[in-house]
């Protein structure tokens, strides 16, 4: 998610505190402890190895900002115009995933990896990120090299004004604070 998108709905043009989707923590993520996050739909995200889930249509493989749907869809029936709690269709059962390892078929309390450390860089168990031997590039997300040696160019965004092409230290807009 880029710095100029709402944390709740993934759309640009407003911040989470001004989100038109309303109440509470909306459809964003809430902290789960142990370094992972759980979406309001019950999906847990503990590493980049888990699939992307779109919060607009509920499908995997893309995020809401890349979704073809113009309006949010009901997570139960997939149609627009209402949300799952107001859906008239029978509730569709979904397989829950373990909050620890992200795999279906068991709960976190029954997970074989419950007491193991998980690396947030490679997603493997048994070590933490600072001890990981698989270096990961923060520019392209691939393993095997670091950002300074990355051949892929990336668009830089200014944290002050949100525009691309320059950094905050190069920004011509006055800081307001």
From Swiss-Prot:
Stored PROSITE patterns: ZF_CCHC (PS50158)
Induction remark: Transcriptionally up-regulated by sterol treatment.
Pfam families reported in the protein's UniProt record: zf-CCHC
Modified residues (Omega-N-methylarginine): 25, 27, 79
Keywords in alphabetical order: Acetylation, Cytoplasm, DNA-binding, Endoplasmic reticulum, Metal-binding, Methylation, Nucleus, Phosphoprotein, Repeat, Repressor, Transcription, Transcription regulation, Zinc, Zinc-finger
Signal peptide (from-to): none
GO molecular function, one term: mRNA binding
GO process terms (BP): cholesterol homeostasis; G-quadruplex DNA formation; negative regulation of transcription by RNA polymerase II; positive regulation of cell population proliferation; positive regulation of cytoplasmic translation; positive regulation of DNA-templated transcription; positive regulation of transcription by RNA polymerase II; regulation of DNA-templated transcription
Cellular component GO terms, alphabetical: cytoplasm; cytosol; endoplasmic reticulum
Modification Phosphoserine occurs at: 49
Keyword Cytoplasm attached: yes
Connected disease: Dystrophia myotonica 2: A multisystem disease characterized by the association of proximal muscle weakness with myotonia, cardiac manifestations and cataract. Additional features can include hyperhidrosis, testicular atrophy, insulin resistance and diabetes and central nervous system anomalies in rare cases.
Name of the protein in its database record: CCHC-type zinc finger nucleic acid binding protein
């Amino acid at each position: 998610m880029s710095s100029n998108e709402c944390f709740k709905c993934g759309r640009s043009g407003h911040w989470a505190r001004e989100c038109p989707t309303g109440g509470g923590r909306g459809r964003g993520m809430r902290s789960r402890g142990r370094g992972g996050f759980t979406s309001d739909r019950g999906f847990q995200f503990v590493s980049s190895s888990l699939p992307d889930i779109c919060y607009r249509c509920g499908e995997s493989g893309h995020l809401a900002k890349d979704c073809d749907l113009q309006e949010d869809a009901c997570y139960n029936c997939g149609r627009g115009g209402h949300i799952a709690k107001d859906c008239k269709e029978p509730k569709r059962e979904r397989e829950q995933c373990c909050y620890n390892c992200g795999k279906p078929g068991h709960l976190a309390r029954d997970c074989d990896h419950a007491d193991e450390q998980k690396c947030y860089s490679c997603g493997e168990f048994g070590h933490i990120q600072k001890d990981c031997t698989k270096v990961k590039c923060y520019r392209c997300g691939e393993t095997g090299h670091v950002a300074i040696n990355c051949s892929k160019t990336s668009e830089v965004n200014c944290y002050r004004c949100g525009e691309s092409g320059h950094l905050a230290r190069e920004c011509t807009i006055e800081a307001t604070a």
